[in-house]
Design a protein with these regions (language model features):
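His/Glu-based metal-binding/catalytic segments typifying zinc-dependent metallopeptidases
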Residues: 32-53, 60-61, 201, 229-291
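Residues that act as N-cap/strand-start positions at coil-to-secondary-structure junctions
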Residues: 19-20, 88, 245
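Charge-rich, well-structured scaffold segments of protease-associated domains
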Residues: 1-8, 27, 82-233, 250, ...
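N-terminal cap/recognition module
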Residues: 55-57, 71
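Phosphate-proximal small/polar/acidic motifs at interfaces that engage nucleotide phosphates
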Residues: 294-295
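Active-site SXXK
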Residues: 62-73
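N- or domain-start disorder-to-order transition segments that initiate the globular core
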Residues: 2-45
Length: 444
């Protein structure tokens, strides 16, 4: 028996081949698209209904997310208790969520119970009644969660950064406040439901061990005839971005034990030709444990337990965001070091060894992200909601493999603009030497 030499690191092998299973499109009789991803050997199915309307389509805060959340609270045939009991009996799990531009209904179920569980889920979407009593309970629960979250400095900093970048009249900069939980009425949810939850505004994904009978079952419940208010027209809306002129904004939280930092500015849209290679640069800068920010600010200086940078994408734009939490006395030093690492990438080429390490990390991350049938659903739902072409994953792979140190230097010089970043610090008001900074304070 050969003994393993643990003093020698295992050899790193190049990823020779990587491909993502393409979904097969089935067009239902009522025109709804069903994307089938047949993979896996277990008799378990994941079903996703994607509603192409979200927070960008609402007329007031909380309307989209509460409409989605209330689907499981009662239909014309079942109460919320009966819905929960039936799903539990069949061993199914239901998840409801809402994003900037979409709502999601996700069901995990055993294949042998698919017909029964699909009947329940179809009833939730097609026959919701939005009972007033359940609505008030949901409001109270979410109001309490809002109050708890509003004590967290990371939440305060994240919200303020979007307010500063987009403006409070833009839906991406407008967050629900305490009074919005009092103002929202069930009639607003019914209005959103009738305008957006219909067969002409939805698509479906099914993954797992998908058989022809699974497809027929889905068509029976969803695709035989149009459902909902299919005559409702979706109004495309636009908003002006009103960026805060201030460089530094401080959100005061007097009892905070530490401060939260968010630095951010507008960056490239996912469809920009430089976007995929910029992702490599941002990963190297602050997107993994061995990044420049982690190596300097965590490992070398010890200012924080963790710091990261990433591209946060929204419809039509994205943000370059740096985030961390640290003791109040270290915050100025952290900001200084962030800019220092940006300058290094703008001035010096990335060493070949470091670039190779980032390549291997990103390629490995892609393999982990898309190795299972259910994660493939996430991948292709992402493609639809982001409005990307099906070759996005192949293009991502090519960008990671082909980007050079010269290209990264050029990208840093063009897109790492310190002047465009807004600094948001949530925590105690700084004292001493920090007061010399021209910092404007926002009281939470």
């Amino acid at each position: 028996m050969t003994q393993l030499d643990r003093s020698v690191a295992p050899a790193i092998r190049q990823l020779e081949h990587f491909s993502i299973l393409q979904p097969e499109l089935h067009r239902m009789k009522n025109g709804m698209p069903l994307y089938v991803l047949s993979a896996g050997n277990e008799d378990v199915i994941r079903f996703d209904l994607l509603v192409r309307s979200g927070q960008l389509d609402q007329s007031q805060p909380l309307q989209a997310v509460f409409t989605n959340r209330m689907l499981r609270e009662g239909t014309v045939r079942m109460t919320s208790g009966e819905i929960a009991e039936r799903l539990d009996y069949y061993g199914a799990w239901l998840d409801l969520s809402s994003s900037v531009n979409c709502g999601f209904v996700t069901l995990y179920t055993l294949t042998k119970h698919l017909d029964r569980t699909m009947e329940i889920v179809a009833g939730l979407v097609k026959e919701s009644v939005f009972p007033e009593e359940q609505f008030r309970i949901i409001c109270d629960i979410n109001r309490q969660q809002f109050l708890v979250n509003n004590q967290r400095v990371d939440v305060l900093a994240r919200k303020q950064l979007n307010r500063s970048l987009f403006g409070t009249s833009h839906p991406l900069g407008r967050y629900a406040e305490l009074e919005d939980y009092e103002r929202i009425q069930v009639e607003a949810l019914k209005d959103f439901y009738h305008r957006h939850y219909h067969s002409g505004n939805c698509s479906m994904y099914v993954s797992g061990k998908v058989t022809p009978e699974v497809v027929r079952c889905i068509e029976r419940h969803w695709g035989e005839a149009p459902w909902g208010n299919c005559t409702a027209e979706k109004v495309e809306r636009t908003w002006d971005i009103v960026k805060d002129a201030r460089k530094r904004v401080h959100v005061e939280k007097e009892d905070a034990l530490q401060s939260s930092l968010r630095m951010g500015g507008f960056s490239l849209d996912r469809k920009h030709p430089d976007y995929l290679k910029l992702r490599v640069l941002v990963t190297l800068f602050g997107g993994y444990f061995g990044s420049r920010l982690m190596s300097n600010i965590r490992e070398d200086k010890g200012y924080t337990y963790g710091i990261g940078a990433g591209l946060v994408s929204y419809p039509g734009t994205s943000l370059l965001v740096v985030s961390t939490e640290a003791a109040n006395e270290y915050m100025e030093s952290v900001i200084t070091e962030v800019y220092h690492e940006m300058d290094r990438l703008r001035q010096d080429k990335v060493p070949a060894e470091e670039l190779e390490m980032v390549r291997n990390y990103m390629l490995g991350d892609m393999c982990r992200s898309y190795e299972g049938a259910f994660s493939l659903s996430d991948a292709w739902i992402f493609i639809e909601t982001a409005g990307l072409k099906p070759d996005f994953f192949d293009a991502s792979l090519a960008a990671i493999r082909e980007v050079t140190s010269d290209e990264l230097l050029s990208l840093a010089q063009r897109y790492f603009c310190k002047e465009n970043l807004i600094e948001v610090v949530a925590g105690k008001k700084p004292s001493g030497s920090c007061k010399s900074k021209k910092t404007i304070f926002e009281r939470n």
